[in-house]
Amino acid sequence: MDDKKAANNSEKSKALAAALAQIEKQFGKGSVMRMEDGVIAEEIQAVSTGSLGLDIALGIGGLPRGRVIEIYGPESSGKTTLTLQSIAEMQKLGGTCAFIDAEHALDVTYAQKLGVNLNDLLISQPDTGEQALEICDALVRSGAVDLIVVDSVAALTPKAEIEGDMGDSLPGLQARLMSQALRKLTGSINRTNTTVIFINQIRMKIGVMFGNPETTTGGNALKFYASVRLDIRRTGSIKSGDEVIGSETKVKVVKNKVAPPFREAHFDILYGEGTSREGEILDLGSEHKVVEKSGAWYSYNGERIGQGKDNARNYLKEHPELAREIENKVRVALGVPELAGGEAEAEAKAS
């Protein structure tokens, strides 16, 4: 009985080996592999969002490489700010980035203030949704672009709608366009390790009596294909005297295929500056005993770095290498990978 079972297993092994050889011959080496052999089980790489709290909430230290990301929320909630900060972080690591501006509303001066190197940024302002997604597909397939932002899904207007009359009803056209594009894109995105971020807007479903009436544009395809979905909301204003200088922001990780979902991050977005990263470092540093807080004074390794949060934040801005050191200690304390990029990134921050 055992001999018969062994012979049967041997036949199966031979048949499997022949099938694998045939598949590799037809589709190339690595098209099928055992889990222990390969690249599949490699640790997921990440790029920082520019917000320490959000990097921690994402569980892997930032947005995953080689995946589709969706960031959605109401108007002026910080969606574009978050993507521009991610572009700046990717550029600090030596990556190439592209911004597909379907809304034709990119503020290049603001992008520069957030640390984006405009000389190295590829920008496209397409006329139709098809053109935008074809450009995105070509950039992904090139394998030479590390991060692509599409701003926004709502502005990806199908060609038939642009060429038609104003009152024409074309139901489901944009949803079909997104579904087809994502079917084409996902394989290439994974193979080339390109991160593609789609910014999306919120709409209200009519006649919803129970449950959440909010939905995102472009159908359901993006919800399924996205590895990470971030819901960003403005929760309050930051004032200096009577003047509003920024907004308090909450981001919820609604979907996460690379770490546990439903975590939240709270941070400040200052107008003209972006996320107050140094403020986050101080808050999380004191919370996890990396930075000592005594009264109004903040200290690190026994040395005082400032009286009051504003002074301590300014001190860390002037000493980026110290800010980086504290941030990495906070990341280690929370079990999140340290920042990549080393001295080059610290120099970029200083300049």
Swiss-Prot record:
The keyword Cytoplasm applies. Keywords: ATP-binding, Cytoplasm, DNA damage, DNA recombination, DNA repair, DNA-binding, Nucleotide-binding, SOS response. One of its GO terms (biological process) is DNA recombination. It comes from the Bacteria. Signal peptide: none annotated. Can catalyze the hydrolysis of ATP in the presence of single-stranded DNA, the ATP-dependent uptake of single-stranded DNA by duplex DNA, and the ATP-dependent hybridization of homologous single-stranded DNAs. It interacts with LexA causing its activation and leading to its autocatalytic cleavage. Belongs to the RecA family. This is Protein RecA. It comes from Herbaspirillum seropedicae. The lineage of its organism: Bacteria, Pseudomonadati, Pseudomonadota, Betaproteobacteria, Burkholderiales. The gene is recA.
